[in-house]
Amino acid sequence: MPVYFQRPENALKRANEFLEVGKKQPALDVLYDVIKSKKHRTWQKIHEPIMLKYLELCVDLRKSHLAKEGLYQYKNICQQVNIKSLEDVVRAYLKLAEERTESAKESSQQMVLDIEDLDNIQTPESVLLSAVSGEDTQDRTDRLLLTPWVKFLWESYRQCLDLLRNNSKVERLYHDIAQQAFKFCLLYTRKAEFRKLCDNLRMHLSQIQRHHNQSTAINLNNPESQSMHLETRLVQLDSAISMELWQEAFKAVEDIHGLFALSKKPPKPQLMANYYNKVSTVFWKSGNALFHASTLHRLYHLSREMRKNLSPEEMQRMSTRVLLATLSIPITPERTDIARLLDMDGIIVEKQRRLATLLGLQSPPNRVGLIKDMVRFNALQHVVPEVKELYNWLEVDFHPLKLCTRVTKVLDWIKEQAEKEPELQQYVPQLQSNTVLRLLQQVAQIYQTIEFSRLSSLLPFVDAFLLERAIVDAARHCNLQVRIDHTSRTLSFGSDLNYSTREDAPVGPFLQNMPSEHIRNQLTAMSTVLSKAVATIKPAHVLQEKEEQHQIAISAYQKNSRKEHQRILTRRQTIEERKERLENLNIQREKEEHEQREAELQKVRKAEEERLRQEAKEREKERILQEHEQIKKKTVRERLEQIKKTEFGAKAFKDIDIENLEELDPDFIMAKQVEQLEKEKRELQDRLKNQEKKIDYFERAKRLEEIPLLKKAYDEQRISDMELWEQQEEERISTLLVEREKAVEHKNRMSRMLEDRDSFVSNLKASRQSVYDAKLKQFQERLAEEKRVRLEERKRQRKEERRISYYRDKEEEEQRLIEEQLKQEREDREKIENEKREAEQREYQERLKKLEEQERKKRLRELEIEEREKKRDEERRGPDDSFRKQDTPSRWGDREESGWRRGADPDERKQAPPERDWRSGGQDSKPVKDEDREGDEDSVLRKDEEQVARGDGDEERAASWRGTDDRGPKRSVEEDGGPRRGFNDEPGPRRGFEDDQGPRRGLDEDRGPRRGLDEDRGPRRGLDEDRGPRRGLDEDRGPRRGLDEDRGPRRGLDEDRGPRRGLDEDRGPRRGFDEDRGPRRGFDEDRGPRRDFDEDRGPRRGFDEDRGPRRGFDEDRGPRRGFDEDRGPRRGFDDDRGPRRGFDDDRGPRRGFEDDRGPRRGFEDDRGPRRGFEDDRGPRRGFDEDRTPRRGFEDDRGPRRGMDEERVSWRGGAEEDRGPRRGAEEDRGPRRGAEEDRGPRRGAEEDRGPRRGAEEDRGQTPWKPVVTSRPASGGWREREKAREDSWGPSHDSKPPEERDWSKRGEDGEKDSERDRRPVREESAWRRGGDDNVTPRKVSPGDKSTEDRKEPSDVRRAAPKTDEPSQWRQGEQKDSQQEERGTPRRVAAADREKPSWRTEKKEEKDAPRRPKLEEDEDGWTTVRR
């Protein structure tokens, strides 16, 4: 290896220089160094000429080992990049070696080498022979010229095959080289090399089978690979047959059969025909006539089945050959008895089985079976006539005297066809031997003794010696009973009367048995003779019966023959179909396996390609870096050389050696170059300036000289143009004149034909008029017929349309009658329900009157006690204290003296925080105002009456009350963003027992007289109330407003809420002007109920959701719950919502009686039907409403919640934040998880009352609070405390002012807790109300229809920041818009901002903390 590295281009140049001076070895060394170098492992275009030159030198110098190393290195270089280059190089190498060998052979007179093995040219025998014998010049020349080149060529073939083995990319080249190697062996008669070549190919094939997982491995299942291997093996078989190497030929046959076994598809017929042809030759050469004939049989059948274009001549030739080969099979068995006994290990049997396997046979063939097959497949009819009778003479006819004469004619004809049919000549000796044996067998059956000369005369083509040999072989092998008497020259047959050693049936023509056979079969013959005798003497009736049975059998066969034939044909067809199906399944399986293997190989190939691509990329990157370095150095060198060529550079770089580039400073070189460039640039600028000045002066002088010349040329051009125009104009005029003269001449000539033209046209029209008239008449008839047909069709269609319209109208009328009937039934049911509700209400009012009377008496006694205590206190304190007391509000005083009870002192209400009920959930955004009440004087009395009503434990009244409302737990206004519903789904919060909207007023408060049943109650006002006159029952102005309200006028019945709807309307509840809830849903809509403004539950579930559609009366899911179902007691007196309102209740009229908000939804209500029996939106929320699951006796959701429960959200705690409580049988889908953001959870510190647990009584009796049997004695504090102890967390008995401020603190804490919770994104359906929003319904059970409208307005106008998800708000809003007749006014706080809808939109962008503000009445409003 040289000490320095050379580039490939330089190495090739260097090698060429060595070759020019005749130094091949140094040139080879230079190229060898480049090829072995590890720095150029990436293939380049220069590698191919280097490799060709390298191999050329190897061939010239006969360096086969160097050629081998170079080829292996080149294979590694270009295998993944350019495999075609490797193929070209290998082919060029072998071609070059063959050419040199051919030239050496031409120079030598020795055509065939005497050397047996080229690998061992100098054997000990050859050395001794050369030493003792003389060697002439020619022999020495042959040995020096031809032998080395033949050896080199053989080594080249072997090395190339080793190089290319088991590589799918060069598989074609591998097989081409193998076939060339076989030709080489055949050309130079190299038997030893042929054997080695066959062994190498066999080893390569086994390696392919072992290393099939390599990336470039050959897939033997590939049809192309199999065909190439078979082609190579057939060439090997041909070469072995040509070289008469029968052992190698037999091995080649086994290799071919092994390749057939590897292939799952059958080989091509042409290939099999060639295979059988070659195998038959091998069998015949090996002396195995039996398998030779069997192979020809297979070839004959294959040709008949597969070859479509088989000519009669070819069929005749093949049939003749098959016949002769079959008859040439020796009659003598291959093995004698002794050989059969000596074959202990079954070697011969195994050999026969292997040979049969090579032909695809299940068992070894025999001579008799082949003859039968030949006859069965009718091969004799295609045999030539001259040979056709040979079969009958040898195998059928018994004529020993003429046998040899006949056979001799056939054999003579075969010998005459030596030129046309050379393959038939080989059968003549075997046919003669078989003829001799047949003659001996037939003679033995006729003669007992015959002379030897007589027998020789019968066999003219056999001499005496061969005849005697044939007789001895027949006696030994064929069990022929013959004895030769040499003294008398005779032959004796059948003289041995012993038992026969074999019981083989006679083969060939048969006349009679031998004497030994008679003796051996005497008993059998006797039995046969007796049977014949019995048959002869059998009576006639037995024969007749037998004949009749025979006829019956024949008739039965004739009857069933067609059916049986059809069954056999069907069975054959079934077998064929099954074969085809199995073949298709095998093909499909093979295809799938092939695809799977291809996929796996593709994966492996892709992985290998990716790896090689990465390696090639890295090598390419390294090569590019090296090239860049070289280019850089080359550029620097060239630049220095250029600089040194200049005058200045030669001086500047005179002492610098260009070869020492690494020692030079790049900055120094660059500075020198820049300096030189600047100098040259300045010189160039000077030259350019001088040139510019020179060109400028020259151009100016030229233009001054050319001005007069241009003027002169212009004048000349103008004159010539004028002359040309005049000439062209004259020519045009003359041409026009000539054309006009010709036109006039044509006109005159054609005018003479005008009369003839007119006469011809008139005659033509006259002749065609009749045809026109006939066609016109025919058209008119067709037109009339078509009109008639179309009119009839139109008439028929109209009749059909009228009939269809009649039936359709009839069906619609029937449907309308059915609907009217259903509507009437629904109205009747509603009427019955209304009457029942009215009866219950009257009963309730009567009971309420009694309770009020009892409460009034109790209150009078309490007031008397208080007055006495007050007097005692005044007497003790004296006149100063009594004077001070006049300014101090009394705890038991009337409303004017207590801001806590008082209706509204604006100053005091601004100062004092509003007292919050512990059941209101701490919702500061929904304060209660006195302005919505008819006077706070009634609240005290009402609360006391409610307490008495709750305390009397009347379960019957509770059941009647709760039966009218089965909506689930009662909710306060703060809970679900809307008023609760009562009997008639009327909105309005109802005051519970412990409603903290102010203490209930006593009888002595200056509220004005209590209203009776029929009063059209204006507001009961205190002395200092400045709210304006209270509205009566008939006023339709909406809720009253105080003097300090600036909310705008209340809307009355006729305000623009849209027309009210009747019973048959299906529009859904009315909506306000700015409502964005979408259109109201009708009866047939299946969208699910609407959702409220601030719901964040996601869309309400529709009818197709998994909790099932809302049920109506006509649904087949079971009856809807009715009045008397066990869904839990209806809410009554002991319900925690407070007593129902009566007629004389002073909290505002109940809806439906004298309510000025429009009549209750009933029969004459034109606001759309209530959600009733057939309403598919789900039943309405009323006393029969089941939009939430009705609470049954077994409902485990805990006690129902009313207005007197204090809760931050409608749902509280871990179990109450999941949406509506569900009954045991509900199928509305999964409950909402605790993590859903539907309001604050119910904390341990919340004082809403006890949570319901599993241990609470959920039996058949309605749940009711624990109340003592008698009312609490003492003042209202004691009663309040008793109620708090029974209903919820106890309140400390502080004065009202202190409790207000403590509640304000609690509110602040809860507000801060709400602020810490994430602000929900307010969607359009959760926004609050504004000026045009229709007010919610107020249930009559809440008794605050007109008294508390403004608090509800304020609550709706200012919802909380984190409003709990209210799953029933949307429904309540819909129902209250249906049933509320009076539009609600907007709160005063709402006029200060456009609407809280817009604030909701703004809160999406910037959520803000709620701010509490108090108005002049002392009510707190949440501003955000």
From Swiss-Prot:
Per the record, the domain of life is: Eukaryota
PCI domain residues: 315-498
Region annotation (26 X 10 AA approximate tandem repeats of [DE]-[DE]-[DE]-R-[GTV]-[PS]-R-R-G-[AFGLM]) ranges? 994-1254
Q: Which Gene3D superfamilies match?
A: 1.25.40.860, UVR domain
**Alphabetical keyword list:** Cytoplasm, Initiation factor, Protein biosynthesis, Repeat, RNA-binding
A molecular function (GO) held by this record is:
mRNA binding
Keyword check for RNA-binding, yes or no.
Answer: yes
sequence repeats (start-end): 994-1003, 1004-1013, 1014-1023, 1024-1033, 1034-1043, 1044-1053, 1054-1063, 1064-1073, 1074-1083, 1084-1093, 1094-1103, 1104-1113, 1114-1123, 1124-1132, 1134-1143, 1144-1153, 1154-1163, 1164-1173, 1174-1183, 1184-1193, 1194-1203, 1204-1213, 1215-1224, 1225-1234, 1235-1244, 1245-1254
Read off the InterPro entries from this record.
Answer: EIF3A (IPR027512), eIF3a_PCI_TPR-like (IPR054711), PCI_dom (IPR000717)
- Provide GO CC annotations from the record: eukaryotic 43S preinitiation complex; eukaryotic 48S preinitiation complex; eukaryotic translation initiation factor 3 complex; eukaryotic translation initiation factor 3 complex, eIF3e; eukaryotic translation initiation factor 3 complex, eIF3m; multi-eIF complex
Biased composition of type Basic and acidic residues is found at 868-919, 939-1259, 1276-1412
Where in the cell is the protein located? Answer: Cytoplasm
One of this protein's GO BP terms?
Answer: formation of cytoplasmic translation initiation complex
Q: Where is this region: Disordered?
A: 821-849, 868-1424
- Stretch forming the signal peptide: none
Q: Which PANTHER family match?
A: EUKARYOTIC TRANSLATION INITIATION FACTOR 3 SUBUNIT A (PTHR14005:SF0), EUKARYOTIC TRANSLATION INITIATION FACTOR 3, THETA SUBUNIT (PTHR14005)
State whether it acts alone or in a complex, and with which partners, per the record.
Component of the eukaryotic translation initiation factor 3 (eIF-3) complex, which is composed of 13 subunits: eif3a, eif3b, eif3c, eif3d, eif3e, eif3f, eif3g, eif3h, eif3i, eif3j, eif3k, eif3l and eif3m.
Q: What does this protein do?
A: RNA-binding component of the eukaryotic translation initiation factor 3 (eIF-3) complex, which is involved in protein synthesis of a specialized repertoire of mRNAs and, together with other initiation factors, stimulates binding of mRNA and methionyl-tRNAi to the 40S ribosome. The eIF-3 complex specifically targets and initiates translation of a subset of mRNAs involved in cell proliferation.
Q: Which HAMAP family match?
A: eIF3a (MF_03000)
In which family does this protein belong, per the annotation?
Belongs to the eIF-3 subunit A family.
The protein here is known as Eukaryotic translation initiation factor 3 subunit A
Q: Which organism is it from?
A: Xenopus laevis (African clawed frog)
Q: Supply the gene name.
A: eif3a
